[in-house]
Amino acid sequence: VTEMDNIMFCAQTHNPQPLHLDEEFCKNTMYGQRIVNSLFTLGLVIGVTVGDTTLGTTLGNLGMTDVRFKNPVFHGDTIRSVTKIQEKRESKSRPDSGIVTFEHFGFNQRNEEIAYCIRTGLMMKRPA
């Protein structure tokens, strides 16, 4: 995660929070430095799994629950993700689709868990 990743995300989402942008302000916080925007972190944790899990098969995200940020992310951190399938079922309203519940875990380079969420998606089914 780069400093520019964080700055650009904050700018694009109109989030001027000093905790993400102001180095002087952050020197006096419990972190001692700027932290990466948590929604960027969550997006990254989910996004890096797409190539291995859902590329070209997602029809839409239906919701997220149990979102937690367990440790801060700092500029220069390296993030990796693990995704588990919690549940899958047929869609009641769309016979060509299924509902899949994913559990996403994000870790930094020290193997500390940095983020977690449960996400439900509307997914394409394989043709019968």
Give residue ranges: language-model regions:
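Hot-dog-fold acyl-thioester-processing enzymes
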Residues: 1-63, 125-128
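HotDog/MaoC-like acyl-thioester-processing domains
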Residues: 69-78, 82-128
